[in-house]
Amino acid sequence: MADYYETLGVERGASDDEIKKAYRKLSRKYHPDIAGPEFEDKFKEVNNAYDVLSNPDKRRMYDSGVDPNNPNAGAGGFSGAGFGDMSDVFSTFFGSAFGGGSQGPVPRTQPGRDALASASIDLKTAVFGGTAHVKINTFSLCQECGGSGAQGGAQPVTCPDCHGQGFMQKVVRTMLGQMMTSAPCERCEGHGTIIQNPCPSCMGHGRVRTTRTVGVTVPAGINDNARLRLANQGEVGEGGGAAGDLYIDIRIKADKQFTRDGDDLHCWIQVPMSWAVLGHDLSIDTFDGEKTVSIPAGCQTEDTVTLKGLGVTNIRNKDERGNLIAHVNVLIPTKLNETERGLIEQFAASHDSGATHVSQASRPQAGQKKGFFSKLKDALS
């Protein structure tokens, strides 16, 4: 007999809340839509365990040594006498009387499955947090019947054929003589109850498939591909059962101006040659509004200027933020009039002293960036 307590990872004396909490955790962990199709059997085991332990009557039966989902798998019957394999053979021919089927009514109310969706946000929302809206298509509670499945909200009535047992017994003639077999009640489909007037909206299922928009609170500092959980926002179960959870995978869209590296943001600014030589204060747009960047005199291409505290919010400490790092690109003029060229040549002559030879030691090494004046000479030569 399967150990349902071990399957859910709880003690035999676990409370209903502990069992439900364990089930929620494991159903999310092994849900085929999340963990992958290879976990489908494990997911079914978890559901079977919860089906028994969440039902007081079934749990009492199980604790007494009889599995409600397989009554003949306990100490009695053929398996108790060492004929487990024969039990399977008999069940093939004669039904659940020989250890094959599940006896007892099947609950109409079943827990809902978890759902998975994705949301795209811009980089600014990732920096400061915000709200994303996701459109999902899932089973929702039928508003017409409130989940009962019956028209007008009426409750199901006891099946007159099986008298609420969910299965029917009959005597059949076999090579071994007359045998008693049992099978799910055809009239109530094993539920033990029938819905006399099914709800026209959900056709007696207590739920309908709908498309709805869900608001998702995005925490500041969230990373790309992070997954958020919204409890009880997944699919409503059969018979209006409790909804599963909704998982949202976050995708951060590329930004035209900034890139992200951990908690730091990076941007690129182009400055005229004169600003790089003399230094200059300029304004740039940031996620915090317009800010001033001070370009130091003698600034080179690929130099950086750091604006502290203007980066991404730290997801673990909302009072901390990374930095905004501005990368400088000095614009070298490619077209000069005679006056401008003359001034540049005078400037170059005063610094280069007419030198035409560069010693080997002063050449840039591999991976070393050229200085501003070297680039200027390259542009004018």
Curated annotation (Swiss-Prot):
Residues 3-66 form the J domain. One of its GO terms (cellular component) is cytoplasm. Zn(2+) 2 binds at residues 159, 162, 185, 188. Zn(2+) 1 binds at residues 142, 145, 199, 202. Residues 356-365 have a biased composition (Polar residues). A zinc finger (CR-type) spans 129-211. One of its GO terms (molecular function) is unfolded protein binding. PROSITE patterns: DNAJ_1, DNAJ_2, ZF_CR. It is found in: Cytoplasm. Residues 355-381 are annotated as: Disordered. CXXCXGXG motif repeats lie at residues 142-149, 159-166, 185-192, 199-206. InterPro entries: DnaJ, DnaJ_C, DnaJ_domain, DnaJ_domain_CS, HSP40/DnaJ_pept-bd, HSP_DnaJ_Cys-rich_dom, HSP_DnaJ_Cys-rich_dom_sf, J_dom_sf. Binds 2 Zn(2+) ions per monomer. Participates actively in the response to hyperosmotic and heat shock by preventing the aggregation of stress-denatured proteins and by disaggregating proteins, also in an autonomous, DnaK-independent fashion. Unfolded proteins bind initially to DnaJ; upon interaction with the DnaJ-bound protein, DnaK hydrolyzes its bound ATP, resulting in the formation of a stable complex. GrpE releases ADP from DnaK; ATP binding to DnaK triggers the release of the substrate protein, thus completing the reaction cycle. Homodimer. NCBIfam families: PRK10767.1 (NF008035). PANTHER family: CHAPERONE PROTEIN DNAJ, DNAJ HOMOLOG 1, MITOCHONDRIAL-RELATED. HAMAP family: DnaJ. This is Chaperone protein DnaJ. It comes from Bifidobacterium longum (strain NCC 2705). The lineage of its organism: Bacteria, Bacillati, Actinomycetota, Actinomycetes, Bifidobacteriales.
